[in-house]
Amino acid sequence: GCHVHFLSRLPSPKIIMQALSEVKPKIVIAVPLVIEKIYKSKVKPVLEKEGIKFLMKVPGLDQIVLNKVRTELINAFGGEFIEVIIGGAAFNKEVEAFFKRMNFPFTVGYGMTECAPIITYDDWKDEKLYSCGKAAPNMEVRIDSSDPSKVPGEIQVKGAIVVLGYYKNGDAT
C-alpha cells in the first residue's frame, strides 16, 4: 500500500527537504515551483562556485560533478524514491534541461481535475526534454486548431476517466 503525506506548514525548501528526509517517499509528486525552489536553494549555489564552473567545462570531469550533484539531490529527496512527477504548471526549461543532463529521475505530466487528473505521462527513462509525456492508457488526446503550424489549438481529451459533469452543477458541466 501507499501513504499520502501532506505538509502541515507553508512549504519552504527547508521544510520540504526536512519532510522528504523523514518520510523517504517512493514517489514524489510536486508542482514545478517546489522543485525549482529546491534547485535554486540546493543545486544552483553549488554550480555557481568558480571551481565547479571550471569543472563543468571539462569533458569527463563535468560528468563526475553531475553524478555527485545527482546523488546529493536524490538523498535530499529522501534517497528512496522511484521518480519525481512534476505537473500543475509549466516547468522551468533551465531546471528541466539540467535535471535531464544529470539523469535525475523525474518526469513531467499534464492533467486536469476533470480527468482524475492525468492526461499525459511517461516514465522518466523515456521522457523527452520539454515534453509532458504520452497520452495515458485509455485516453485519446488531440489538438484542435484551424492552422496547427500558426494558431495555438484547444487540447481535447476523451477517455473513461474524464468526468461526465460536475456534481449537482449542471450549469458548469
Please give the residue ranges for each predicted region.
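Conserved AMP-binding/adenylation subdomain of ANL enzymes
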Residues: 1-72
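Conserved AMP-binding/adenylate-forming
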Residues: 28, 65-173
